[in-house]
Amino acid sequence: MLISADAPLLIGDGVGELPCDANIPVGFNTEWEYTLQEAQIYSGTTILLFTDGLTEAMNINYELFQMDRINEVANKALAQQRIEPRELIEQMTEAVHQFVGEAEQSDDLTMMGIQFIKKTEPSA
């Protein structure tokens, strides 16, 4: 899913990038040896994955949407306490559509939001 030079966003107590090493897409090369990567993610954190179609969405002036705008939308969503994956993707979609305006879509645009919810143990 992650076909972008940019790391996925982590949105919880703040907005940051998921620390990860670059890899190639799954299935691209059957001989590729992927490295195991781990990160601590806290309950309630939303992970936003996206293709380069988001960062490279272009308006009629040939300006790109880029990470600054993605972070701006994510920070606004966090301030409004609207970081549920569906809400976050809706806000990001609206922001990119407003930015692009009447320009033709130059690339596919895919986003996926995942929210980590820690399972609580039942009371004894």
Listing of model-derived features with the role each one plays in the protein:
Residues 1-124:
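Conserved subregion of the PPM/PP2C metallophosphatase catalytic domain
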